[in-house]
Structures are given as C-alpha cells and as structure tokens.
Amino acid sequence: MANSKQKNLLVTTALPYGNGALHIGHLLEHTQTDVWVRTNKMEGNNVLNFCADDAHGAPIMIKAKEEGQDPEEFTKGIQIEHLKTLKSFGIEHDHYHSTHSVENEQLVNEIFTDLVKANLVYEKEILQLFDDQEKMFLADRYIKGVCPSCGAEDQYGDGCEVCGITYDAIDIKKPISVLSGTEPSKKKTNQIFFNLNKCKDFLSSYLDDLSIQESVKNKLLEWLGGDLQDWNISRDKPYFGFKIPQHDDKYFYVWVDAPIGYIAATKYYCDENKIDYLNLWGKDSNY
C-alpha cells in the first residue's frame, strides 16, 4: 500500500558551466544536495535528482578555440570530466543532461514562439562592437576594457567584477577584442529584445505569493521597483547555441536556453521512463 504521506520531489542544482573543471563551490552544492536527496529517499519519499551542463555561450567558444576544438566536441569532453569528478565524490544523479540537446532546442523554440504571439519580443537596431580583423560582432565576453563606472581595468563587456555594475558592451571604455587583441569599431545590427516591463505586474504578483525567505523576496521586489530594461536575447553568428527561428544569422543568448535546460532534462527523463508529470519543481536561483 502506498504511503499517503509520501512526497514526490524533483531536486535540481545549479548547472555547471561547460568551459572548465568543477570547483569547490560546485562540489559543496552537489554534496549538500546529494545528502538531502539520500535522506528523503530513506524517509520513503519519491525523489528525483536532476542536473545538466550549461553548454552554450561565448566563454565556451573562446576556450574551445584556445584548445583547438569544435565547441560541441569540447563541451562533450568537459561533461565527461564533470561526471567523473562527481562520481569520485560519491555524488549520484537520477539523470544528468546537457543544455545542448534536442529537447532543450525544441522547448526554447516553443517558448519563443509563444513570446512572439504574446507580443513580448521585438526587433531593434542597435550599435554594437565589431572586430574588423575577425569580421564578426562581439558578444559581451568577447570584449575587455575599462569599467565605465569605477574605472577598473580588464573588465568584461557585460559587467564589472570590482564595483558590481552591469552595462552594455558598447559603453565600456577602451574596448579590446579578446579574439584579436585589436580595438573594435562600432556597427549597426538588429537584435531581438524581450520586453521585461510588460511582465512587471505579473512578476510582482508572483513574488507576493512565493514562499521564500523575506530577505530574498525584498531584494527581488526592489529590482522590480523601477522600470525594467528590455533584455537583448539574441547574438550574432558565429555563436555556439541555438538558432532563432526565422532569423538565420541570429542565435539565442545562452541565458535564454540555460534555465529551460532544467525542463529539458525533466522532459527527457519523463519521456524515457514514461512518466506523465512530477509534482514539485524547484530551482535555487533568484535571477
């Protein structure tokens, strides 16, 4: 007879990025999760522990180029090493997936199509840094320069690790291409943006009903206190990621498909094991 108090739990951990070895922070989180999962299984709960490698983006392209490898093959090798490390610490997963998967691409495209139908995305012409030697537009991690706020040197094109500010790559001072070491020019290009302000009321209402620590909730509500900047969700080719439907030269920014990777891992497991649904979905990530 089934235990009426049995809980069905889906547990996830932050996705390790596929450009290098696991660090102590990864191992701490995965160890804590593994202990919690084992404890709940011993208590008779139905628990599934999923994770995946975050396998897209500019840093992977840069590292793969340094290693003289194709990005896809490079990330496959990194994932093998990640799994070896986790196994050596006795950490087990019911399924370990990758964001570079058929399931994830399918889900990303479905969600993007729904966003288009809901008029939550639009195309806009912007100025962007361009490497004239490599003949390509430069995503944030392809650029280093001086922080436009505090003046710290050797900062990436998306944010300063010294003062914590985020900015557009076009605003960084004394920009240098990570690829060629040259100063980039500025060129116009069309990018696809997600209208965050249209979702502001929904997000505020959602947070009000969410059972999380008050300090975390207050910080998130603080972010929603003013106007939200629209989010550039596209990147120009060449880029290691998923192509955007009806935009042959555009790819989804890695932060579009990475969170959906949790759903993709779940879909893969459910399809393989003929499970219709799971009762709880959780992710310890404010962003």
Residue ranges and their predicted role:
Residues 2-51, 103-107, 150, 173-287:
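Structured secondary-structure scaffolds
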Residues 20-27, 93, 97, 123:
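Histidine-centered catalytic micro-motifs
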Residues 50-59, 99-104, 126-127:
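Short, solvent-exposed turn/loop segments enriched in Gly/Ser/Thr/Pro and often Arg
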Residues 63-76:
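A charged helix-plus-loop insertion that forms the helical arch/lid used to bind
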Residues 74-77, 94-106, 132-150:
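Aromatic/His-enriched, Gly/Pro-containing loop or helix-boundary segments
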Residues 80-94:
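A glycine-rich helix N-cap at a beta->alpha junction
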Residues 105-123:
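Hydrophobic or amphipathic alpha-helical targeting/insertion segments
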Residues 119-193:
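Cys/His-rich short segments
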